[in-house]
Regions:
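N-terminal compositionally biased, intrinsically disordered segments and leader/signal-like regions
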Residues: 3, 32, 68-69, 75, ...
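C-terminal motif of bacterial Sec signal peptides marking the signal peptidase cleavage site
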Residues: 39-41
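Low-complexity proline/serine/threonine-rich segments in eukaryotic and viral proteins
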Residues: 16, 27-36
Length: 677
């Protein structure tokens, strides 16, 4: 065969295929050789960290001033940089070396004499491997720093270059002392920094977020109260004093870390901690503003201010880990109108607080506030002079409660309380009742109490003297040792709807006897009315006592309900749909006298679907009618100690009374109805 093989391929195809196979084999061989060359010619990945050690100063050395820290660092390749640390803080980075030695010049600014610190160096190579030296310990010499004591009588600046500044003993600041950002001030045990003792003085300490000013104890092992604190005294300059981004710690031996009695000090973005007393204490004109400051570890109240300085308390303060995380209010009388804002922490009131002055001050408590009262302390409004209290918790319940495990004396509204500007709305009042007091007491003034819960009191819930309420609605009174409410008969009608009085030791509203001279309507409540004295309805105004359907009145022994005895009066008791009950405080015949309808009782008087029970204590029946002609229908009159009905000087027909009413269980030896002349 010529030109083509038996399969039809040409000679050209046959030879060219062989050539291609040879070329492919050569390329594979070449690639393998190149790979071997690369593997043999490239070094391995660098994963070895440098070796590094500090060679100066020596472990245990004392440092008295600027010091050169030397570290020797080696690596299998090269060290790129060295990082120097004091304790956990980086103080510098060095990228050049003399051979294998890296040096950093360190000034121990802010390091207090007598303290001990750890030095460490990290060496980093080009691959990012990081090697650490063993730490060495150095001691700061007691000769380090700038020392101060005595009196500063001219303006002075404490620079960061001369830091730390050491206060060796009491220091009187009688001019403006400026402290630069980053300065550390160490104070000797028992020493005080007093500002404005004799002449105007001030402290301007405007630290920064990244350059805090620290005022601390020089003692290397300090505790709360090691030094006394900073005191702005009576002659402190009235402007210019500021503590911003400052740390004040381990003081309080003088009562507080910072005490402001004058000077209108501004405190902002500080840290106050480890006090043996309070954190900040302010009185008089001592404080202009306090905001964004953290208080912790205070053995006393972290913030304590006079009543007139509450407005100086701004936003952003935090109270954590103190003996009591609350703001102490110091003083006895609110003499100017003020608003207490909700700062996120309770107000602690350690003595009785009075709101009263000739200027008629109004104390407004913001929604969400909590006012905590010490044992036997009270909140009194309008004592001797006008005053008002507004506590509207519509957008956040306001709490009035006990500060500790004991009881406080509660809220007292006195006769000169301003009723137009006094109201409790959506409040909680609890833990009161010290010395038998009520949670709320009203003396001859009608205030508004609505949507409020009064609970857990050692005394009564609400006690009124010669007064009722402007409004008393949707309130809950529960958990009281005593009755939920004491009120005179004349003012029962001021008790509104929607109230709950259940769950008290005495399960009834206590009604004090007396004369009803104006129209009154007794509304149905969820507990009975317990009447403790005779109630007489009558006056020149011809008052009507209206009893709502379903009302229950329980009368103490020897008491009665009299209508029209000496002056015109009227009783309207229509028990539709639910009957009205007049009964004794105990289920014994003769417990109370009964209802007496005298000659001045209006002919419009009605008793319909009422129950008159366990009366007759005056031997005149449960229902005594003398000279009047009331309407009596569908009543139950029973369990008398004598007669059920006693008629005298009236045209009422006994048989008609028997037919239209149910008389039963009168005493043996008596008739159901006695008919006199």
């Amino acid at each position: 065969m010529t030109g083509n093989d038996e399969l039809g391929h040409s000679d050209f195809n046959r030879h060219s295929g062989f050539g291609l196979r040879v070329c492919r084999s050569f390329l594979v061989l070449l690639s393998s050789l190149f790979s071997l060359f690369l593997l043999a010619g490239c070094p391995g990945e660098d994963i070895t960290p440098p070796d590094v050690a500090i060679i100066a100063p020596a472990d245990g050395d004392s440092i008295a001033g600027p010091t050169t820290i030397r570290a020797r660092a080696t690596d299998n390749r090269a060290v790129a940089r060295a990082e120097f640390f004091v304790d956990s803080t980086e103080i510098g980075v060095v990228t050049s070396s003399a051979g294998d030695t890296f040096e950093y010049n360190w000034t121990p600014a802010g390091m207090l004499p007598g303290t001990t610190h750890a030095l460490r160096c990290y060496a980093i190579d080009g691959a990012g491997n990081r090697g650490s030296s063993p730490p060495i310990t150095v001691h700061i010499s007691r000769a380090v720093g700038t020392h101060h004591s005595g009196t500063i009588g001219a303006p002075e600046t404490w620079t960061v270059a001369a830091s730390p500044h050491i206060v060796d003993s009491d220091l009187d600041v009688e001019a403006l002392l400026t402290i630069e950002p980053g300065v550390t001030v160490g104070v000797a045990d028992g020493a005080t920094i007093a500002v404005g003792t004799h002449s105007p003085g001030g402290i301007s300490a405007p630290g920064r977020t990244d350059s805090t000013i620290t005022l601390t104890a020089i003692n290397p092992a300090p505790g709360p109260g090691a030094w006394n604190g900073i005191e702005f005294r009576a002659n402190a300059a009235t402007n210019g004093s500021i503590l911003r981004h400052c740390v004040v710690e381990y003081a309080g031996g003088g009562g507080a870390l910072v005490r402001c009695d004058a000077g209108r000090v501004d405190i902002d973005s500080c840290v106050f901690r480890a006090s043996s007393g309070r954190g900040v204490s302010a009185s008089g004109t001592g404080l202009r503003s306090l905001s964004h400051t953290a208080f912790s570890g205070c053995a006393g109240y972290p913030v304590s201010v006079a009543l007139g300085l509450v407005s100086a308390l701004g936003a952003g303060n935090t109270l954590t880990g103190n003996k009591r995380n609350a703001i102490e209010l110091v003083g006895s009388t609110v003499t100017a109108s003020d608003t207490w804002p909700n700062l996120g922490f309770p107000y602690a009131i350690t003595a009785t607080l009075t709101v009263a002055d000739s200027s008629n001050p109004l104390l407004t408590v913001a929604p969400g506030c909590s006012l905590l009262f010490a044992d036997s302390a009270a909140l009194r409004v309008g004592v001797g002079q006008p005053g008002g209290l507004t506590a509207d918790g519509t957008s956040g319940t306001i709490a009035f409660a006990a500060l500790g495990p004991g009881n406080w004396r509660g809220i007292e509204f006195w006769e000169k309380t301003d009723p137009l500007h006094t109201a409790l709305n959506f409040c909680r009042v609890g833990g009161a009742g010290a010395a038998g007091s009520a949670a709320i007491t009203c003396y001859s003034v009608a205030v508004t109490i609505i949507n409020t819960r009064i609970a857990g009191n050692a005394g009564s819930g609400v006690y009124t003297f010669s007064t009722g309420f402007a409004r008393f609605e949707n309130d809950t009174v529960t958990g009281c040792v005593g009755s939920p409410l004491h009120i005179a008969a004349q003012y029962v009608g001021t008790i509104g709807n929607g109230n709950s009085f259940a769950g008290n030791s005495e399960p009834a509203i206590q009604v004090i006897g007396g004369t009803i001279t104006q129209n009154v309507r007794y509304q149905r409540q969820d507990v009975p009315y317990h009447v403790t004295g005779t109630v007489d309805v009558g006056s020149q105004y011809e008052p009507a006592l209206t009893i709502e359907s379903g009302v229950v009145l329980q009368f103490d022994p020897g008491t009665a309900l009299t209508i029209g005895l000496a002056a015109p009066g009227q009783l309207l008791a229509v028990g539709v749909p639910d009957s009205i009950t007049f009964t004794g405080a105990t289920a014994e015949p003769g417990t109370w006298h009964g209802i007496e309808l005298h000659r001045y009782a209006s002919s419009s008087t009605q008793l319909k679907r009422c129950r008159l029970l366990y009366g007759g204590g005056a031997d005149q029946g449960i229902l005594f009618i003398n000279g009047s002609v009331p309407t009596l229908d569908s009543n139950e009159i029973a369990f008398s100690s004598n007669y059920c009905v006693y008629l005298q000087n009236t045209i009422l027909d006994p048989d008609t009374l028997r037919q239209s009413n149910w008389l039963h269980d009168w005493a043996p030896g008596f008739d159901d109805i006695f008919e006199g002349p």
